[in-house]
């Protein structure tokens, strides 16, 4: 009798060992099956399904979208691409002059209406929200893009984070996002109800890999984005019965002023590419296969997200250590650049 036969005979004679082996085999089959289904869903979402038709969100029917952080980068692209789809745009951002230029560009290119609201999200000022409320009064709004956000100027230990930077990040990323949503969402619900649910509403909020993965040296920013994950999922549960889809959009690096990256690459899209992938796949999960009301839309980011979730895990010590080492290195290089600039400036004065 071979050793394998002896092992099988031993297991068969021991009920506990038999059931343990059976359970292990069934569990293994279950895990393999669920992984295969998630991977298949990832491929279908990313590469097979057609782009979402925005007529379901009221495009080309005289409806409006509100876009925050609209003057530059990703926010500007959201405004342009939503206007191209036939939505009039309320542009919300800090710099009036930039908003005016963008409003002119949108109106001339896409023949839709625009409104502008100069809004400093770093100041939790009641006047800001009253002005926004006045601007959208009686408008048939179907879409809100919560794009306004701020990160650290450079990676920094939490205990060394300046109080102003800490307050600004929380105020902009969290307080302003929630309060703007409280102002705009009732208008979206009213528009959906008025249409007798012939159109749906949509609220997209920008998340980040920094919130997906706890990120040392960006602790405040990381926490602020993780908060938006839980908030968006909870809000999705509340508003879905009212005909409003709520989704957190997760991105890795995108070329922008905030990321300080200028050149796009295979894994780093420009704002136009990123927003196009987002609007084309609203309602799908792409890389966020295990998360409710969450989408990682850009294909390279989606594959990275899926790989991390299904290997080491986002909350693992391995992921945390890799993040720690990466951002510590970025901080070291940034401090050297600051030191060099300061030295050159001092030499010029002399």
UniProtKB/Swiss-Prot annotation:
GO terms for biological process: fatty acid elongation; sphingolipid biosynthetic process; very long-chain fatty acid biosynthetic process. GO terms for cellular component: endoplasmic reticulum membrane. Coiled coil: none annotated. It is found in: Endoplasmic reticulum membrane. CDD domains: 17beta-HSD1_like_SDR_c (cd05356). Disulfide bonds: none annotated. Its main location: endoplasmic reticulum. The lineage of its organism: Eukaryota, Fungi, Dikarya, Ascomycota, Saccharomycotina. Gene3D superfamilies: NAD(P)-binding Rossmann-like Domain. This is Very-long-chain 3-oxoacyl-CoA reductase. It comes from the Eukaryota. Keywords: Endoplasmic reticulum, Fatty acid biosynthesis, Fatty acid metabolism, Lipid biosynthesis, Lipid metabolism, Membrane, NADP, Oxidoreductase, Transmembrane, Transmembrane helix. It comes from Lodderomyces elongisporus (strain ATCC 11503 / CBS 2605 / JCM 1781 / NBRC 1676 / NRRL YB-4239). Its EC number is 1.1.1.330. It is an enzyme of class 1 (oxidoreductase). Belongs to the short-chain dehydrogenases/reductases (SDR) family.
